[in-house]
Amino acid sequence: MLQPKRTKYRKKQKGRCSGLATRGDRVSFGEFGLKATTRGPITSRQIEAARRAINRYIRRGGKIWIRVFPDKPVTEKPLEVRMGKGKGNVDHWCEPIAPGRVLYELEGVSEEVAREAFRRAAAKLPVKTTFVNRTVM
């Protein structure tokens, strides 16, 4: 699973993700991309599950780029613990996604194969997505 090797601080505030994506909103590396149309956090496990779904379908046919990296720690308190007594321990890592962000890119496969691979990957993600071409951008 993806997570930073080291961070300046162990824990972060929850924060809010507003507006549209200003960076990472274009297909830069491959021919086709999977772009988010809604906002929400994506965990490292969801990123990995979608990557596996894409790889399983394209079968070494092309190259895949993962354009998101989970760098925000999510904390959780243990079960049956009363409120207070400080912030909980880091449970997992996530990436806040804004609408317009390109999540994955593919090249070296046909458009039909890319569409189906991204459709299967989108089923693993908590945000709604759309298929984009490099020429459209």
From Swiss-Prot:
One Pfam family hit: Ribosomal_L16
Annotated GO MF terms: rRNA binding; structural constituent of ribosome; tRNA binding
UniProt-listed GO biological process terms: translation
Keywords: Ribonucleoprotein, Ribosomal protein, RNA-binding, rRNA-binding, tRNA-binding
Gene Ontology CC annotation, any one: cytosolic large ribosomal subunit
SUPFAM superfamilies given in the database record: Ribosomal protein L16p/L10e (SSF54686)
Stored CDD domains: Ribosomal_L16_L10e (cd01433)
Keyword Calcium found: no
Gene3D superfamilies tied to this protein: Ribosomal protein L10e/L16
NCBIfam families xrefs: rplP_bact
Family that this chain belongs to: Belongs to the universal ribosomal protein uL16 family.
Function: Binds 23S rRNA and is also seen to make contacts with the A and possibly P site tRNAs.
Self-association state and partner proteins as the record states: Part of the 50S ribosomal subunit.
Record-given protein name: Large ribosomal subunit protein uL16
Natural source organism: Halorhodospira halophila (strain DSM 244 / SL1)
Recorded name of the encoding gene: rplP
